[in-house]
């Protein structure tokens, strides 16, 4: 494996940008592209989208896995948070919905995916640990994606387990994070 030296300046931007309540988004300069013709309203960073398409094609996912949420503006994240408090309560919302400028969705590097079925839950879509979803989970690191929020890391990430939420960090970072069973916060410290 090729070694790459990163300094602090390079760690906290680009594909390794860490966005959470302790590291709020400051700027939002990203090149977005629609996920697909069918899902024009869901946008991602161009490279992340390309890698996601390749990953799904590699397992012949077709329409079995569908995108639920890509990039969100500050206003969209604020509305989602506020609406969730009204509909689901504060405790639930704090577990599953990030505050505005604390959401990775504002970077264009995060995607929520779901098993394609009727009545998909927008906040907690079904993405089980079997079948085509598990196949995606296994190959995702080869294409630069990590499963971002795991149950055993919630004390670090401050977000409950979200098996549907994938974050593009690029390769080889995705492989290292997965192989060492780290969350992004731990990986940034590791670097």
What are these regions (language model features)?
Residues 1-191:
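Extracytoplasmic cell-surface/polysaccharide-interacting catalytic and binding patches
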């Amino acid at each position: 494996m090729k070694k790459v030296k990163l300094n602090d300046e390079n760690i906290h931007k680009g594909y390794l940008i860490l966005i959470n309540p302790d590291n709020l988004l400051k700027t939002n300069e990203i090149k977005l592209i629609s996920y697909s013709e069918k899902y024009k309203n869901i946008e991602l960073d161009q490279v992340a989208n390309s890698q996601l398409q390749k990953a799904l094609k590699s397992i012949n996912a077709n329409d079995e896995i569908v995108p639920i949420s890509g990039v969100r503006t500050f206003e969209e994240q604020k509305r989602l948070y506020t609406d969730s408090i009204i509909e689901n309560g504060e405790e639930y919302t704090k577990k599953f919905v990030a505050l505005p400028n604390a959401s990775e969705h504002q970077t264009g590097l995060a995607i929520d995916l779901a098993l394609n079925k009727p009545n998909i839950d927008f906040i907690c879509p079904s993405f089980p640990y079997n079948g085509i979803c598990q196949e995606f989970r296994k190959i995702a690191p080869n294409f630069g994606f990590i499963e971002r929020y795991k149950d055993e890391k919630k004390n670090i990430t401050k977000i409950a387990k979200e098996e549907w939420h994938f974050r593009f960090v690029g390769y080889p970072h995705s492989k290292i994070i997965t192989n060492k069973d780290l969350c992004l916060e731990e990986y940034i410290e590791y670097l």
